[in-house]
């Protein structure tokens, strides 16, 4: 019975099912059986105890080893106590043996097993702890990735919707699909990604029930399919917009777009909600498994649903998108090729027409030049004359010189088209313009000039002479040759023959022309002497023979007055009709042939031989009449009208018109010619103002260069030119008019003369000025009166001359035709004529105050004021003249107050530039002409910002908000027109005084409220009728300027050529500096002048603060230098990468094409953006749908890891996040809209701009 008690004790203490011990105790077997049972029972118990203990310890890994040992020791103690206190009535041999031996055997067996199990438990606990930390890290990482994708998708697509709603520019039909796509992507993130993330983060358990499992699967399929169908609709929209643009407005209407969007949102419901809730999508086994395990939400589909849903959701829309974008890509490539071919042909045709300059029909322009049919004659001379343009190329490698060196031309065949694709409206316009500008003479011949031989004049080639012409040419009287050389130093005369527009007879004597003021008669282009006479090619003997015959024939007709000097002579080519007459024997028919030229003819050849020109008294100080009336920006239509009026032989009155020597109007008015420096300056000034087109004729360049030259050089340079004026109503011969007193008075108006008008002429106020096109001068007295009234006579010849030019920004508001096309060069203010030393006088000779003037101010008669011989009046823009007020002793601090405006109504440009004061000299610091090669300028100019009202923005005095206005007092700077990237519309500020009877003068300039001038606050008499007021937050400007910006350089004009499209520098073998690139950026809206002044003012005020310790300032300078060095290294590496990339980095133009190389339209750019979206869509969803179809068709035969399935799902979801990022990166309109929206929604992202402009 003891065995039964031991079994009961073990069952209650150890909870072990010891069934073998109970069976052995209840059996009443024999002694042998009992003995065997007693030997087997302890071993069985020991095995059960050990295994049970091990199982117990392994099933409770959190329990510690001492607790387990104590529990076993207590069990063993109770076990021994029970064994020893058994009942005596049950004493037997079996019980006595069990009580004595089994207890010690049990203890000896359990002890070693417990020690071994304790070591195994410690190792298992450490390994499981490491696995738990790894699982927790993976869980946190997955949660971060899932939440980031979801937030980016929701916020990005919401930003797309808000931006389109706020920006009216984005409200186009295509963006309707974009907004709908953004809505679908945002719902994918909210309804599909969130449920999937919860399942993955919870270990695969579904916590929302079976119904929500179906909802989740339906929403996932629905929104994903809707997003893909939106991309398909966008591709169709782009296809019609680019490939079929004519059908696009008819097909893509609002009704069509609404119908497409309705299908996009309805069709996915047919493959998502309906089959999933009805149970059509899966198998019966999967439905039973879902009912048995509601905590599982797996999406298992059958083969039919897999094929249908994948086709509707991905395969069909993907194929449609591929086809559409392939067609779009092919069309875009075709258009780009056509665009490139057209641009190349336009360039070639422009060069071709620039050399030929030949209208298409000579008989149309001049139907009566010759009476014989020229068709056969043209065919005979075509072989010799068609290649002249190849023979007359200039001896330079630059392409810019080719279009200018077209002075000596013989007619060539009409320019032919190089390809069919080159037909362009600009070609037709160019051809029409060439017809208009060369109506005077179709061949555009060069008039023969008698000049002194120079070192590079043409050498007479070895000719093949016509014997008859050569014999007649040798019979030239020697007295005429001596008569020709009798006046070597006098002004040279332009000799030519005349041909009327109606017939080929000479014009009558009454319509002869006379010479006036030959000083500057050639439109400031006398300096291109060496550019206009080209060397003849030596490789075409036939061409040389024709030119030599032409020269000798013309020499014979003019009586042999033109000879070849020691250095060679200049040859004038006749027109094509004269060549025809020469070959047809025109000399025998009794008709005198005339050579047509572009300039007006002075007189017949006989008169020119009989009456050589005498020097005009006072001609050294003559005045260019063309700078008064002919230097206006006329369009081609106006020029054509003027030339037609000139050719009409009627009595409408006299008029005069002049053109440059065989130059196009665009070349003449843009100042072409004069060397490479002039062309470089023209490129730099071409895009200074955005209020005019780059190719608009500009008359100010030639005048400005002319005004900066000394009088002696001008006389020497332009002594060969003549000025042509038509005095048809005069009955006196031309030589008598030249010696008349009126002409002397006319010349004295611009020379040294004591005559001064005390007051401005009342008849020439700005509204009463005559129109440039309708100005008629009947006599020289009227012309002299106009000149005298529009000029400033000398007041004191001994004083320093006050140079005047025709560039200014101070424009009269009541007579404004168009603003100047070029920026203002540096201005120099000469305070006093008597108080000026020789160095200041020399500086005044080299620079100029660039102003327009209409009438002299009251202080114009002050001593020291002297107009130069190049003073001009432009009828295009008339402005007021700020003149210095005479001060006995000039004060450098108050020198800038002398600039005042004599007009109460002014127009101020919105681009403001500071003026540097260095002694008596004032310069425009930021003007691009400050660094001109022909003007002296310093490399570094510092602008002081403290004291008075100095400094832009008034960074001197007290901190706060100050305004930049124009007032009466406190003038420290002068408004100058400058070239800047910050250009607005013309801002008009009109000032007037109440109860003012007499003309008052209001000074111009910037006045700061933080200045020491307290009387500026009294503006009771100031009436502002409208203008721009610029406010500067000085504290914010100081914060911005204190930020380290690296190395900054002074703005210097770039030597690189300018892009004809955007005005930026065209990069060559080396890159430009970072400052030049930043300056050319048109998106920078901060005024550079204000920035420069604020920066320099802050740098000047920093040493005065004295609040920083020496260590802090030294460390700041150290890090500033380090930052500057890193910036410079980065810029050098960037330039090194762009070393071999030529062309404009802004618009893509390479310098030769008229259009940009990357000139896609807006539709092409939208197609490119959406094409990138389509590519990203394919990369994201294609792997998922491949897995989806393969696993659905194969079933259990194609197993796939769960991790791969999760990765494929979230790659597809990531497509919804990438779409807004693609919009922001590739589409500039969306990028700007995103920036504006973020600045409005999030105030912390708003840029703090201290410069604000308000319209008052």
From Swiss-Prot:
The keyword Transmembrane applies. It holds the Pfam family 7tm_1. Residues 165-171, 237-258, 327-1169, 1224-1256 are cytoplasmic. GO terms for biological process: adenylate cyclase-activating adrenergic receptor signaling pathway; adenylate cyclase-activating G protein-coupled receptor signaling pathway; G protein-coupled receptor signaling pathway; positive regulation of MAPK cascade. One of its GO terms (cellular component) is plasma membrane. In the adult, expressed in the inferior and superior protocerebrum, the posterior lateral protocerebrum, the deutocerebrum, the surface of the subesophageal ganglion, the lateral cell body region, the cortical layer of the ventral nerve cord and the optic lobe medulla of the central nervous system (CNS). Also expressed in the nurse cells and follicle cells of the egg chambers in the ovary at oogenic stages 1-10, and spermatogonia and spermatocytes in the testis. Expressed ubiquitously in the embryonic CNS. Disruption phenotype: RNAi-mediated knockdown in the prothoracic gland results in developmental arrest at the larval stage. This larval-prepual arrest can be rescued by supplementing larvae diet with 20-hydroxyecdysone (20E). Glycans are attached at residues 36, 113, 117, 196. It is a multi-pass membrane protein. The lineage of its organism: Eukaryota, Metazoa, Ecdysozoa, Arthropoda, Hexapoda. Residues 1-143, 193-213, 280-305, 1191-1202 are extracellular. It comes from Drosophila melanogaster. GO terms for molecular function: G protein-coupled amine receptor activity; octopamine receptor activity. This is Octopamine receptor beta-3R. Residues 757-770 have a biased composition (Pro residues). Signal peptide: none annotated. It is found in: Cell membrane. The keyword Membrane applies. Keywords: Cell membrane, G-protein coupled receptor, Glycoprotein, Membrane, Receptor, Transducer, Transmembrane, Transmembrane helix. The chain crosses the membrane at residues 144-164, 172-192, 214-236, 259-279, 306-326, 1170-1190, 1203-1223.
């Amino acid at each position: 019975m003891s065995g039964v008690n031991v079994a009961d004790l073990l069952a209650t203490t150890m909870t072990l099912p010891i069934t073998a011990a109970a069976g052995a105790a209840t059996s009443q077997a024999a002694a042998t059986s009992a003995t065997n049972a007693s030997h087997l029972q302890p071993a069985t118990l020991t095995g059960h105890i050990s295994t049970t203990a091990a199982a117990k310890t392994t099933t409770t890994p959190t329990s510690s080893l001492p607790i387990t040992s104590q529990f076993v020791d207590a069990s063993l103690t109770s076990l021994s106590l029970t064994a020893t206190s058994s009942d005596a009535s049950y004493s037997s041999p079996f019980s006595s043996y069990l009580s004595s031996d089994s207890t010690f055997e049990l203890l000896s067996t359990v002890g070693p097993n417990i020690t071994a199990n304790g070591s195994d438990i410690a190792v298992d606990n450490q390994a499981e702890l490491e696995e738990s930390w790894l699982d927790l890290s993976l869980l946190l990482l997955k949660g971060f990735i899932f939440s980031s994708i979801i937030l980016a998708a929701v916020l990005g697509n919401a930003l797309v919707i808000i931006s389109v709603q706020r920006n009216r520019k984005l409200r186009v039909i295509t963006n309707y699909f974009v907004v709908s796509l953004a809505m679908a992507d945002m719902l994918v993130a909210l309804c599909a990604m969130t449920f999937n993330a919860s399942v993955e983060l919870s270990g695969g358990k579904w916590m929302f029930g079976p119904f929500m499992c179906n909802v989740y699967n339906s929403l996932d399929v629905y929104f994903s399919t809707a997003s893909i169908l939106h991309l398909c609709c966008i591709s169709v929209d782009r296809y019609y917009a680019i490939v079929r643009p004519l059908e696009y407005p008819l097909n893509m209407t609002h009704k069509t777009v609404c119908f497409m969007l309705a299908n996009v949102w309805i069709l996915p419901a047919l493959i998502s909600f309906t089959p999933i809730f009805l149970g059509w999508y899966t198998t019966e086994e999967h439905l039973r498994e879902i009912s048995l395990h509601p905590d599982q939400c797996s999406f298992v589909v059958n083969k039919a649903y897999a094929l249908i849903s994948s086709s509707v959701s991905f395969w069909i829309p993907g194929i449609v998108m591929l086809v559409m974008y392939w067609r779009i890509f092919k069309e875009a490539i075709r258009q780009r090729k056509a665009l490139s071919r057209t641009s190349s042909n336009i360039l070639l045709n422009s060069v071709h027409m620039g050399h030929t300059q030949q209208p298409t029909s000579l008989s149309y322009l001049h139907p009566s030049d010759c009476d014989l049919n020229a068709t056969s004659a043209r065919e005979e001379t075509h072989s010799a004359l068609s290649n002249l343009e190849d023979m007359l190329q200039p001896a330079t490698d630059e392409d810019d010189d080719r279009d200018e060196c077209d002075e000596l031309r013989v007619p060539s065949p009409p320019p032919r088209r190089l390809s069919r694709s080159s037909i362009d409206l600009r070609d037709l316009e160019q051809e029409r313009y060439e017809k208009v500008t060369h109506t005077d003479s179709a061949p555009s011949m060069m008039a023969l000039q008698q000049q002194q031989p120079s070192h590079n004049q043409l050498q007479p080639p070895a000719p093949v002479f016509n014997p008859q012409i050569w014999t007649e040419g040798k019979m030239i009287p020697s007295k005429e040759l001596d008569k020709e050389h009798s006046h070597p130093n006098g002004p040279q005369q332009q000799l030519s023959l005349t041909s009327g527009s109606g017939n080929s007879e000479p014009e009558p004597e009454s319509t002869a022309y006379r010479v006036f003021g030959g000083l500057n008669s050639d439109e400031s282009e006398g300096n291109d002497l060496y550019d206009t006479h080209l060397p003849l090619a030596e490789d075409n003997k036939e061409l040389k023979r024709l030119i030599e015959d032409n020269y000798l024939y013309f020499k014979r007709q003019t009586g042999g007055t033109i000879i070849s000097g020691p250095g060679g002579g200049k040859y004038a080519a006749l027109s094509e009709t004269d060549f025809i007459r020469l070959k047809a024997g025109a000399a025998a028919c009794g008709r005198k042939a005339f050579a047509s030229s572009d300039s007006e003819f002075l007189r017949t050849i006989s008169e020119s031989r009989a009456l050589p020109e005498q020097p005009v008294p006072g001609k050294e100080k003559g005045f260019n009449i063309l700078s008064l009336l002919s230097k206006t920006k006329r369009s081609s239509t106006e020029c054509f009208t003027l030339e037609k009026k000139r050719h009409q032989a009627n009595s409408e009155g006299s008029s005069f018109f002049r053109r440059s020597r065989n130059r196009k109007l665009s070349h003449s008015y843009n100042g072409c010619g004069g060397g490479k420096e002039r062309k470089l300056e023209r490129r730099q000034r071409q895009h200074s103002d955005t209020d005019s087109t780059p190719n608009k004729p500009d008359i100010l360049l030639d005048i400005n260069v002319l005004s900066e030259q000394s009088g002696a050089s001008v006389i020497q340079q332009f002594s060969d030119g003549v000025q042509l004026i038509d005095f048809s109503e005069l009955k006196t011969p031309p030589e008598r008019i030249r010696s008349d007193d009126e002409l002397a008075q006319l010349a004295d108006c611009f020379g040294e003369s004591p005559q001064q008008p005390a007051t401005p002429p009342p008849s020439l106020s700005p509204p009463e000025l005559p129109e440039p096109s309708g100005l008629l001068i009947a006599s020289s007295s009227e012309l002299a009166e106009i000149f005298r009234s529009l000029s400033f006579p000398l007041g004191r010849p001994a004083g320093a001359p006050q140079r005047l030019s025709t560039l200014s920004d101070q424009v009269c508001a009541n007579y404004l035709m168009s603003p100047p096309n070029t920026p203002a060069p540096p201005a120099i203010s000469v305070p006093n004529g008597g108080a000026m030393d020789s160095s200041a006088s020399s500086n005044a000779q080299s620079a100029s105050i660039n102003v327009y003037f209409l009438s002299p101010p009251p202080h114009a008669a002050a001593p020291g004021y002297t107009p130069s011989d190049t003073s001009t009046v432009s009828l295009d823009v008339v402005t007021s003249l700020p003149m210095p007020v005479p001060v006995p002793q000039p004060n450098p601090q108050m020198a800038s107050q002398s600039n005042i405006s004599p007009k109460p109504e002014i127009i101020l440009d919105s681009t403001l530039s500071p003026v540097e004061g260095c002694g008596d000299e004032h310069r425009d610091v930021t003007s691009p002409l400050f660094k001109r090669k022909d003007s002296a300028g310093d490399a570094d100019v510092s602008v002081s910002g403290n004291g008075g009202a100095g400094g832009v923005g008034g960074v001197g005095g007290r901190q706060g908000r100050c305004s930049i206005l124009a007032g009466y007092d406190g003038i420290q700077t002068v408004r100058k027109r400058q070239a800047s990237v910050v250009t607005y519309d013309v801002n008009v500020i009109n000032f007037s005084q109440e109860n003012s009877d007499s003309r008052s003068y209001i000074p111009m300039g910037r006045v700061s409220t933080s200045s020491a001038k307290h009387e500026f606050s009294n503006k009771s008499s100031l009436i502002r009728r409208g203008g721009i007021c610029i406010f500067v937050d000085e504290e914010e400007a100081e914060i911005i300027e204190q930020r380290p910006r690296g190395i900054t350089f002074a703005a210097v004009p770039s030597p690189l050529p300018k892009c004809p499209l955007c005005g930026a520098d065209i990069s060559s073998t080396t890159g430009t500096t970072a400052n030049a690139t930043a300056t050319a950026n048109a998106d920078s809206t901060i005024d550079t002048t204000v920035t420069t002044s604020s920066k320099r003012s802050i740098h000047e005020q920093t040493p005065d603060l004295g609040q920083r310790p020496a260590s802090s300032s030294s460390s700041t300078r150290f890090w500033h230098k380090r930052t500057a060095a890193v910036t410079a290294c980065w810029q050098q590496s960037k330039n090194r990468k762009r070393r071999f990339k030529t062309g404009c980095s802004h618009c893509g133009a390479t310098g030769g094409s008229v259009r940009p190389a990357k000139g896609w339209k807006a539709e092409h750019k939208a197609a490119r953006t959406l094409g990138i979206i389509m590519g990203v869509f394919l990369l994201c969803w294609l792997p998922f749908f491949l897995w989806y179809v393969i696993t659905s068709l194969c079933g259990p035969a194609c197993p796939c890891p769960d991790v791969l399935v999760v990765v494929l799902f979230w790659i597809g979801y990531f497509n919804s996040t990438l779409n807004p990022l693609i919009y922001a990166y590739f589409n500039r309109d969306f990028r700007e809209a995103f920036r504006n929206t973020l600045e409005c929604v999030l105030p912390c992202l708003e840029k703090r701009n201290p410069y604000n402009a308000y319209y008052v």
